[in-house]
Amino acid sequence: MEPEAGPVLYQKLRVWEPSLESEEEEEEISEQLILDASGPHDSSGNKAGRLPGAWAQLVAALLLLAIGFSLAVRQLCSSGASPGALGSGAPPASGHSHRPGVYHHGAIISPAAECSRLGRELFVAGGNIVDAGVGAALCLAVVHPHTTGLGATYWGLFHNSSSGNSTALTSGPAQTLAPGLGLPSALPALHMLHTHFGRLPWPHLLVGPISLAQKGFLVDTSLASALAAQDTKGLCPLLCHANGTPLGPGTQVTNTKLAAVLHKASLAPTPDLSGDALLSLLAEDLGLEGPSVGPRPTLEPALQLPLPQGILFTTPSPSAGPELLELLEASLQSAGPSPAPCPALPQAAAAPRSSVLATVDSSGSVLLLTSSLNSSFGSGHLSPSTGVLLSNLVAESAAGAWACPLIFRDISDDTEVDVLGLVASGTPAAARVMTHALLSHLARPQTPDQQGPTESPRACAQGTLLQVAAHTEHAHVSSVPSGCCPFQGF
């Protein structure tokens, strides 16, 4: 009787010898080995004494297989770590490691982890620093409505490493949409910047922000803290619970109206048309015929200050760039081996809340962006048709008094640092930190591995400073205070 389960047949291989040529001898070579834990079967004519040797060979083969698999896993773990983990310097495929914030190709740093991640994804998709920066800025417009948004005013500074030129993005003169409400210019400004310097298609940059607004995002600590300190009456129901209390950390928020505006903007072929979708809906909300003149952002050559060590670039008036250049020039001409801590800046009438981000690649191209709604949550009243908070920045004198991004291009032979970028949140105190950091760098030039903005901002009061640099074909990002702003790279 045949067994219920068929036996497993193996061929025992013998070294071929000329004397073994007959069919009968070849048939005798074939032996039947049955793998059965109950013991060996002798139905094939095998001698029981031969089975232990076969089992030993099988065990040895399995052991070798296990060892080989283990070695392969260890090799993958040591060389295949994913680069660009949030806030990490994961070792690249080349096998050497870096400190956190140092990457081979490009990096981005922003106030929101979700937006830094989105910027990195645009890098990986083949985009450049402008694609990553603009995409992250649109993301911040969704997840950080307390500091920025589609109603915000934007300033930017872009340095092209290939040409050596730096270009300033200006918001144009402050305009009023309605009493106490600033004319929104974010969409045409960002679209203009991308049209001239971006690489990926414009709609690609809005896919992530649209998804966040449509499917929802989580309230982070920064937004939750701002909500806790704010009268939320004009922010409900978007940022409130059903009982009117502000949302806390980890609460999911969806803004479908904003998603619809972003979708329309993604289809606009020109910067001017990208802002029209928002303006037409805002006019309906406010009962207006529409603004007589649209926003007028511009791209123009950055201001320059030649120095013995290199060239300093910043944004033109009405930003705070010219005043900062005057301050830096006066500080460098004054006697003394080192810069004075926290040099005083010209006093501004107000210190509006703002948002900053920075991107850099290993070739030395840098993009710095800063934006503001003037106050926390701007006007404090949510547009029901658009899900947008408008700015209350309407005084032309204050249109850019808070904006002062700086880029230093090194042309000396004494240091390997190619480009250094600094951008601070919109307070005079933070700008003093930025000025002091630049003066310290000029007085004692060091590599980014040796130097970083690790000074506590408490030395010059509160503020946020982002620093990016390109050095020895690597991109470097860091912040003051350390850890305040998530970064990613690849």
Swiss-Prot record:
Pathway listed: Sulfur metabolism; glutathione metabolism
Extracellular compartment residues: 74-490
Glycosylation sites (chain numbering): N160, N165, N374
Modifications made to the protein after synthesis: Cleaved by autocatalysis into a large and a small subunit and the autocatalytic cleavage is essential to the functional activation of the enzyme.
Transmembrane segments: 53-73
One GO process term, biological-process aspect: glutathione biosynthetic process
Membrane topology, from the record: Single-pass type II membrane protein
Reactions mediated catalytically: an N-terminal (5-L-glutamyl)-[peptide] + an alpha-amino acid = 5-L-glutamyl amino acid + an N-terminal L-alpha-aminoacyl-[peptide]; glutathione + H2O = L-cysteinylglycine + L-glutamate; an S-substituted glutathione + H2O = an S-substituted L-cysteinylglycine + L-glutamate
A GO molecular-function descriptor: leukotriene C4 gamma-glutamyl transferase activity
Keywords, sorted A to Z: Acyltransferase, Glutathione biosynthesis, Glycoprotein, Hydrolase, Membrane, Signal-anchor, Transferase, Transmembrane, Transmembrane helix, Zymogen
Positions on the Cytoplasmic side per record topology: 1-52
Main location: membrane
Assigned GO CC terms: membrane
Known EC number: 3.4.19.13, 2.3.2.2
Subcellular location(s) of the protein: Membrane
Protein family according to the UniProt entry: Belongs to the gamma-glutamyltransferase family.
Function: Hydrolyzes and transfers gamma-glutamyl moieties from glutathione and other gamma-glutamyl compounds to acceptors.
Record note on quaternary structure: Heterodimer composed of the light and heavy chains. The active site is located in the light chain.
Name of the protein in question: Glutathione hydrolase 6
Organism: Bos taurus
Taxonomic lineage: Eukaryota, Metazoa, Chordata, Craniata, Vertebrata
